[in-house]
């Protein structure tokens, strides 16, 4: 049997992990064992937060729409219900953008929603 020397492979693997851990604090960026654990944990956080980001943005859009709609004297739920009844299909992302950038257009949407206002 020929002797198998794995130094090159191990060094390459270690370098790859340490490169991923570049910028981490202390031993996490220098010691392979600690860096490997840090990189694994970072990957878990990354996976989780890619899904969480979608929820966070939806919350942000709803908050922005709610704030803009209340200036016109309507609640968020009433506004969304009225838009649905009026067959105006604009998603929350675009509504939030309109609320910030184009106040006149948003005011017309709010007035349209007020005319079909839900009964509470």
From Swiss-Prot:
It holds the Pfam family Ribosomal_L20. GO terms for cellular component: ribonucleoprotein complex; ribosome. CDD domains: Ribosomal_L20. SUPFAM superfamilies: Ribosomal protein L20. Disulfide bonds: none annotated. It comes from the Bacteria. PANTHER family: 39S RIBOSOMAL PROTEIN L20 (PTHR10986). Belongs to the bacterial ribosomal protein bL20 family. Binds directly to 23S ribosomal RNA and is necessary for the in vitro assembly process of the 50S ribosomal subunit. It is not involved in the protein synthesizing functions of that subunit. HAMAP family: Ribosomal_bL20. This is Large ribosomal subunit protein bL20. It comes from Baumannia cicadellinicola subsp. Homalodisca coagulata. The gene is rplT.
